[in-house]
Amino acid sequence: QNRQCCESNLEPLFSGYIETLRREAECAEADSGRLSSELNSLQEVLEGYKRRYEEEVALRATAENEFVALKKDVDCAYLRKSDLEANVEALIQETDFLRRLYEEEIRVL
């Protein structure tokens, strides 16, 4: 009888414990589905950010290449301008020389 008394006292205790574990398992299963859905959503967002980052990297590379090309063009234009300014200065000096020479010849005549 003592054994039967212990079994009957423990059975409700274990039944309650089992029920609690079942509820926790159901909650864990529900959380698993929710978390799986959230994970998928976050992975999609991450993929979007990765694509955008790669696009921005490509745009930056393109911009850097364009900058290098423009810098070459500007450097060439600056050198051309310097050459033209030197030519203008040389022509001004030649014109002044020829004018003075002409004036001297006129004076001599």
Curated annotation (Swiss-Prot):
One annotated GO molecular function: structural constituent of skin epidermis
Pfam families named in the record: Filament
Disulfide bonds: none
InterPro entries, A to Z: IF_rod_dom, Keratin_II
Gene3D superfamilies, alphabetized: Vasodilator-stimulated phosphoprotein
UniProt GO BP: intermediate filament organization; keratinization
Domain of life per record: Eukaryota
Residue ranges, annotated region (Coil 1B): 11-109
Domain IF rod: 1-109
GO cellular component: extracellular space; keratin filament
Region Linker 1, annotated ranges: 1-10
UniProt keyword terms in alphabetical order: Coiled coil, Intermediate filament, Keratin
Assigned protein family: Belongs to the intermediate filament family.
Other observations noted: There are two types of cytoskeletal and microfibrillar keratin: I (acidic; 40-55 kDa) and II (neutral to basic; 56-70 kDa).
Protein name: Keratin, type II microfibrillar
Organism: Ovis aries (Sheep)
